[in-house]
Amino acid sequence: KKMVGIVIASHGQFAEGILQSGNMIFGEQEDVKAVTLMPSEGPDDFKAKAEAAIKSFSDQDQVLFLVDLWGGTPFNQTNNLFEEHKDKWAIVAGLNLPMLIEAYASRLSMNSAHEIAAHIIETAKDGVKVKPEELAPKEAPKAAAKSGASAGAVSYTHLTLPTICSV
């Protein structure tokens, strides 16, 4: 049975570390590769490594990219590769361990990168929890659709991110 190939992409060795963690929990996986952007490397180095990872998959028709950070170099370079395969490939940013494990489990029954990508987002979000529970954000009412906001739109107005020039 053909399985969706998974590229885990990150700044630094995060991708290799989370690959190891996922294997400890779920077992060794075929057609999964970690692709890292190291401090001494540039976008072209990363892209070449990503292309080599994809070429190593037994089936390159269906590829899912799990990326650490939306808008960073690993995302931008995987996005460049993705552009020619939008109908089959998918990218999910915000990589965490629940996301990776759910992707592994989903590959057993789901045959498309799009299907897996859509499925793992909720699990990834649910993996972010806090104790004590009262520190958790209050559930916002699901009224975005009525207010005319486009479906699937996400608002980041509540986040204050540091400005990082080198990503």
Where are these regions (language model features)?
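A short beta-strand-loop structural module common to alpha/beta enzyme folds
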Residues: D31-P39
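Short, acidic/small-residue loops that bind anionic groups at enzyme active sites
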Residues: H85-A103, I116
